[in-house]
Amino acid sequence: MARFTPLLMILLALVPLYYSLDCRKFSFAPACRGIMLKRSGGHPMIAEQQPMIDNAKAREVQMMELLIRNIEDEALIANSDCVSMSWLRDRLVNAKNEMPQ
């Protein structure tokens, strides 16, 4: 029994440290892993990227509307029911290259 007394004392000294572990400071400690993930909510990086994605989608819709209007105007000017595929392809490529970053 005397052999295990130091081991038991060390174990009893470490138990309060385990329960007093600050999970805000050591979020990846095995005892804190589940707690901090449940409390954190959404990741801030995702919240920052969502408006950028929405803005990109809005710009894409505006660009497509502008291209459709330009194609319709060019078709009316040319008095033609069809627009050539090469002209349409060139127009789309040029519009994509001119799009502000």
From Swiss-Prot:
TM helices/strands, residue ranges: none
Processing and modification events after translation: May be degraded by the nep-2 peptidase.
Keywords, alphabetical: Chemotaxis, Pheromone response, Secreted, Signal
Localization in the cell: Secreted; Perikaryon
Tissue: Expressed in coelomocytes, the ASK sensory neurons and interneurons AIB, AIM and PVQ.
Coiled coil: none
GO biological process terms held by the UniProt record: chemotaxis; regulation of chemotaxis; regulation of olfactory learning; response to pheromone
Position of the signal peptide: 1-20
Gene inactivation effect: Suppresses the olfactory plasticity defect in nep-2 mutants, which are defective in the plasticity of chemotaxis to benzaldehyde. Double mutants of snet-1 and daf-22 suppress the daf-22 mutant olfactory plasticity-defective phenotype to levels similar to wild-type.
GO cellular component: extracellular region; perikaryon
Biological role stated in the UniProt entry: Negatively regulates chemotaxis and olfactory plasticity which is the change from positive chemotaxis to dispersal after prolonged exposure to an odorant. May be down-regulated in response to pheromone exposure, resulting in promotion of olfactory plasticity.
Protein name: Protein snet-1
